[in-house]
Amino acid sequence: LAALERVRPALTRIAEILALKRTAINLLDAYLGHQAGAKVLTGQIKRGDGQEINAVIWFCDLRNSTPLADSMSREAFLGLLNDYFECLAGAVLDHDGEVLRFIGDAALAIFPVEEGGWSKKEACEAAVKAAKDALERMAELNRQRESFGTAPLGFGIGLHLGDVMYGNIGTADRIEFTVIGAAANEAARIEGLCKTL
């Protein structure tokens, strides 16, 4: 018992360090995504770092959000956005994609093609499954909205496979992980075409 009492402070410190590491991992995963968060935690990232990757780019956007925002309280509109993102970004995460950023009422995500990971076919299949899942989730959310007498939400999803620069950009004090390149622009353009379909 005396021996345990002597090592207790060291064991307590180890437990605190492990708890802090777990907290850091959870925060980085939540704010940066799993892949980017792991790189930051291990010190592999500095501003301007990037690599060319092949990935399915996912871009989704909520329709008519400005009139919605103008007709609702801030709290209600933020709740609506969270419900919407839970459906769309939640589907991305549940199918092992990585959400890179939320841009107002839009989201950008990737399904990367990697050695030892997904092939192009597998990345495309995962992205399409996520899109179908998102459609089902939004259909359920819209059924709930209609049962409360509110209009259904419109949205679009654009998917495109291509090469992009994946890395971080920003200032010395604030950086952000993103993808840049023609494939990312194409995904956004494809999503925009959903408005007329």
Question: What is the predicted role of each segment?
Answer:
Residues 164, 193-197:
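Cytosolic regulatory/linker segments at or just downstream of nucleotide-handling modules
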Residues 57, 107, 155-161:
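A structural signal for short, well-ordered beta-strand segments
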Residues 168-171:
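Cytochrome P450 core scaffold surrounding the K-helix E-X-X-R motif
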Residues 4-8, 74, 127, 183:
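Short, charged, low-complexity patches
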Residues 2-52:
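Regulatory cytosolic signal-relay segments
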Residues 82-97, 113, 117-157, 182-193:
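Alpha-helical scaffold within the catalytic cores of cyclic-nucleotide enzymes
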Residues 44-129, 177:
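Catalytic NTP-binding/metal-coordinating core of nucleotidyl cyclase/transferase enzymes
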